[in-house]
């Protein structure tokens, strides 16, 4: 049996551009793609913290070191420059490997530069 687990997350990254008439997808600074282990053309989920929108698209490379997060195509109607979003990718993990699985959790500063990399979501407490 396989389970779908969180593989990668870029947490609270700011949208820098929205390009309605671009071909589609989400352009992500290549440094962040590498840190999160997200491949070009990989399916990603985007959760907009500002407005609650949730949608699925795919990742393309943005200029390395630029901090670029460009929401493109029809998805551009679901975000605005300055919105904080979470970008996530999932993987099918065999049941035997679930306990050993560690996601890549990337945290950024206000310029979308990586500040921290974690491999575990902390337990939520009251």
UniProtKB/Swiss-Prot annotation:
The lineage of its organism: Bacteria, Pseudomonadati, Pseudomonadota, Betaproteobacteria, Burkholderiales. Catalyzes the pyruvoyl-dependent decarboxylation of aspartate to produce beta-alanine. One of its GO terms (molecular function) is aspartate 1-decarboxylase activity. It is an enzyme of class 4 (lyase). Is synthesized initially as an inactive proenzyme, which is activated by self-cleavage at a specific serine bond to produce a beta-subunit with a hydroxyl group at its C-terminus and an alpha-subunit with a pyruvoyl group at its N-terminus. Pathway: Cofactor biosynthesis; (R)-pantothenate biosynthesis; beta-alanine from L-aspartate: step 1/1. It is found in: Cytoplasm. Disulfide bonds: none annotated. The keyword Cell cycle does not apply. SUPFAM superfamilies: ADC-like. It catalyses: L-aspartate + H(+) = beta-alanine + CO2. The modification Pyruvic acid (Ser) is found at residue 25. This is Aspartate 1-decarboxylase 2. Its cofactor is pyruvate. Pfam families: Asp_decarbox (PF02261). Binds 1 pyruvoyl group covalently per subunit. One of its GO terms (biological process) is alanine biosynthetic process. It comes from Polaromonas sp. (strain JS666 / ATCC BAA-500). The gene is panD2. InterPro entries: Asp_de-COase-like_dom_sf (IPR009010), Asp_decarbox (IPR003190). Substrate binds at residues 57, 73-75. HAMAP family: PanD. NCBIfam families: panD.
């Amino acid at each position: 049996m396989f389970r779908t687990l969180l593989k990668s997350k870029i947490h609270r990254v700011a949208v820098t551009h929205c390009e309605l008439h671009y071909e589609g997808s989400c352009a992500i600074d290549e440094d962040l793609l590498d840190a999160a282990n997200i491949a070009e053309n990989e399916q990603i989920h985007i959760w907009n913290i500002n407005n609650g929108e949730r949608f699925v698209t795919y990742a393309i490379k943005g200029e390395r070191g630029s901090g670029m997060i460009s929401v493109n195509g029809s998805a551009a109607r679901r975000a605005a420059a300055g919105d904080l979003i979470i970008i996530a990718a999932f993987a099918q993990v065999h049941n035997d490997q679930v306990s050993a699985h560690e996601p890549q959790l990337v945290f950024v500063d206000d310029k979308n530069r990586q500040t921290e990399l974690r491999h575990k979501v902390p337990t939520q407490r009251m």
